[in-house]
Amino acid sequence: MIRLIRGNNVPSLVFKRSLFVPSNSLTNKRKRRIPPLKPRSSNKEGGDIKQSRITDRNQTSRTVGVSEKLPTQIKKELKDLRSFTKVIAQHLKPEQENDSLTSAEKPDTSQLPPIDIEEATDDIFGQISGTKKSSVEVAPPPPPPGLDIPDEIKERLGLLSELLVPEKSSNSKLPEKQVENNWKLLLSQLDQAGGLSGLSKRTISKFFSKIPPKNLKGLIPIIENMYNKAEMSIPHPIYYMFVRSLTLGDKISDTQMQLIDKYFQEISKQTDLKIDHYETMILAQVKNNHMEKIDGILALMKTKNIEISKMIYTSIVRGYIFYQKDHQKALETFDSMKFLSQKTQPDEKVYTDVIVSCIMHREIEKALDLYYELKDKGMNVNQNLLSTLAKGCSRSKQFKTQAWNFLFQIYDHGWVPNLQTYEHMLYIAARDGDVELTRALFYKMLQTNSVTVRAFRYLILSYSKYVPPHKRKERYLILLNHKGQLFRENILQDVDFSKPIHGFPFLPSSHIPDSKFVLAESSAIWAHTVMNNPSFLRQQTLVASYVSIALELDDFTEFKNRFNSASYLNKDGIPKVREIEIIEPQQDEPTETVTATEQQNTSSNTSVIRSPILNQLQQNINDNQFKAPRDSYLYNLAIKAAGKFKNYGFAQEILHERGQFRKSNSFKSLSPKQQHQDDFQFAGYLVECWTNMNLLEDAYAVVLSSIDRFPWSWRELGVLNNAAMKLGSLELAEAVRKVAQVTQVKHHGKIKRQDFKTYVMKRGY
């Protein structure tokens, strides 16, 4: 490189040599060969510059001469450099080549110009020996600071000690596995260089404390082996480091929990357990889902007069919410935090977790009270909390008008909606039956390649909640807000369904004219998903929404087709029974003619709303790889459809299959409480089904056969009682009322009439 220096108004040129790769325009130039002269020097006389270069003949002799004059320390550094390069090439190169995050696009070596090896060698030797001098010294950029490793260990590692740099000062985006491998390399080199022998405990602890906890988890066996080789006992701070690394993550396995218990026993042998030890111990039990062991730990703390800290309360609350799913105990612990002392006052994170738990258990009013309490205390709210409140309010008839208000508060804070917020927008619009807005929001997700399974499920849910305009009595929730009106209008105007994205089969219209539009588009979308994303279709909640579309839009033929094509009975665990089917010839020929005519009309109507590609796929696919196994909720929908469309044959078919489902492994895997709840729900829908068909005696027989098992109430028996009154069956109506009274007293603790009279007589008023 040539630089121009002005001094005493006389310009002069100074050469600065550097190693660089020229551009392709310079690669075809022939390299000029300089005749051998004296060793490198530069003489400036009258503006003339003379520069000498070492030739190939003199290179060997000069290298030997320089190396003989080098001090011993520099020779050691050169040796370490060669060793360092060799070790790095063996350990890191193969993994970096296979790692997509760290591999860079390498240029073709055939296109690179030849590099002056002589000049590069001179520069390296000059930098090490300090003999290289330039007329203008330019300080090189400082390297990133290395880890503060103790000097004793740094001497054993040599140049390998510079392999790792702190995460905050490192500009490289190495994956976590690569960093862990680097630490393995470092520990391996230290083990070969003498290990931990001769090092003080303080030096060893300082070195191991530099390992990030997320990487330490996989290095614990190596470290324990190094202590064993050095015949040293592991001090309790190192054991605690092991425990902290093992408690990372959402869940802790039983094997990891055994190690944690073992390490805590070793710690207790060396020192008394402190508050931070108990905090970590309780956190580990929570993540291992053993909340019953926490009471024993708290009792042990009480005997040692150790006060329960805020962190312990926080871990217990989160354990009840996310691991035990015990909402009431979570609320009790949360209230204890608020009223116990000032030190244990819950922060915004605990408030957020409890609010989420309230929304999960449909206690929207309690969630809103906690939200306003949080704001009154001056705590910060976040985007996820607001979007979760919006989703919870949309489920409540009382607070559903506030749903969009919480979402628009996100924009008021200046936050950009994240993926969770966008999914909750889809959910609120879908639950409200606003198919047009849901389609537009999903179209936006297609444009940004951010479609998730949850978003797709909400799109199908919107079709199942659709109500034709002439039947809808309420306005869409988003239209009750001025900001919502502008938001909806802008979204719909910004979407052009005539331009499909990724082949997604939206019909080319932003307006939904009638129910046939919904049936046709949902069928086309299902066919597209079968071909492109079949893994989406194995979710029972998604299939339930897809089947409900035909149920809500009064199309039994389409409902039965979707029920059979999108779900199947999982026969795992069902005992095989030999069945004999007797088919009797039908004698009513006119009935067959009418049936054939009805089937022809039905097929013509179905051809409009059913995707032809889906029909072809169903004919060619015989297995259940694109179907979801049926659960109790799907059987409830099926028996409800049989009663709504008054199809006795389909009801008998579902009733028989539901009995087989109860013998399957999927039903037996449920808890006894859940099994009882599912059976009671199906029995309630069965009573409603027989009542809709005017089979009141059959409906009453279902109630009478399970009077000792199920807590029948007016919620399930009201339909049967009203139907009996309309048909003039007063005896049946009286019997139904007696069943309701008996079960309410037995299962709900309602006071009997005679007991109430006795109570009033004793009270005197």
From Swiss-Prot:
| Pfam families reported in the protein's UniProt record | PPR
Q: Which GO terms describe its biological process?
A: mRNA processing; RNA splicing
**Entry keyword annotation includes Membrane:** no
- UniProt biased composition (Basic and acidic residues): 42-56
Q: Where in the cell is it found?
A: Mitochondrion
- What keywords is this UniProt entry annotated with? Mitochondrion, mRNA processing, mRNA splicing, Repeat, Transit peptide
Gene3D superfamilies cross-referenced by the UniProt entry: Tetratricopeptide repeat domain
Presequence positions on this chain: 1-63
Region named Disordered: 26-67, 92-114, 585-609
Q: Which GO terms describe its cellular component?
A: mitochondrion
Presence of keyword Repeat:
yes
Q: What segments bear the compositional bias annotation Polar residues?
A: 592-609
What is known about what this protein does? Regulates mitochondrial small subunit maturation by controlling 15S rRNA 5'-end processing. Localizes to the 5' precursor of the 15S rRNA in a position that is subsequently occupied by mS47 in the mature yeast mtSSU. Uses structure and sequence-specific RNA recognition, binding to a single-stranded region of the precursor and specifically recognizing bases -6 to -1. The exchange of Ccm1 for mS47 is coupled to the irreversible removal of precursor rRNA that is accompanied by conformational changes of the mitoribosomal proteins uS5m and mS26.
Question: In which family does this protein belong, per the annotation?
Answer: Belongs to the CCM1 family.
According to the record's subunit comment, the protein's assembly and interactions are: Binds to mitochondrial small subunit 15S rRNA.
Q: What is this protein called?
A: Mitochondrial 15S rRNA processing factor CCM1
Can you name the source organism? Candida dubliniensis (strain CD36 / ATCC MYA-646 / CBS 7987 / NCPF 3949 / NRRL Y-17841)
Underlying gene? CCM1
